[in-house]
Amino acid sequence: LKSSRGFSISLGVAALNTSIAAPQHQPDFEASKIMAEKGKDGETVLVGDFPFTDRLRQQVKTLHLFELQRVAGRTPPDQWDDILGRCSVLGLTGTTLLTRAMATYLEKAPQAYTVIIGPTTPLSPVLFSHGADVLAGSQVVSPGPVFDGIRQGMSFREFKKLGIQFVAWSKDTI
């Protein structure tokens, strides 16, 4: 995890996730639903473009999409710092840990209810002490079919149906 190389960091996070399991009796909730509920009256920041982005935009008062790729509806990067200082909800892709940007986002939005989202989310309770409120990631429950899908070059969206379980862990339950 201390490497400067993205691939090495990814392997470190994957290894970490194999050794840490979220508590078994978590409420059944999705990251996008939590963000919609928490963001209905304020400003929501979503770092990374997710399949639920358009739906979330309809469910919150204001959605700011922080995305480096030029996608429709993204917020210009020169506005990010100001928005982070006042947002009420912050959704971060777990990839921000790999790119070394997570700490910066957490420091600039200490007031925000923060959800870390996606298959690269480290399911480590350490993140709760650094500002995360919810860890919404995934675990492999059927390794054989998932590994076969990876070997065949399937995308995550394709092989997740083969044996991936989505999990969400709230700091309120620890």
Please give the residue ranges for each predicted region.
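Conserved acidic residues
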Residues: 42, 88, 133
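Histidine/lysine/aspartate-rich catalytic loop segments that bind and position anionic ligands
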Residues: 52-83, 88
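A short acidic, amphipathic alpha-helical/loop segment
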Residues: 55, 59, 101-108, 126
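Structural motif
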Residues: 45, 89-93, 115
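Active-site glycine-rich loop that binds ribose-phosphate moieties when present
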Residues: 26-32, 69-79, 97-99
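C-terminal functional extensions of proteins
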Residues: 115-174
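Electropositive, gly/pro-rich neighborhoods at or near active sites that engage anionic ligands
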Residues: 1-51, 150, 167-174
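A short helix->loop->beta-strand "cap" motif at the edges of active sites that frequently abuts
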Residues: 61, 109-113, 132
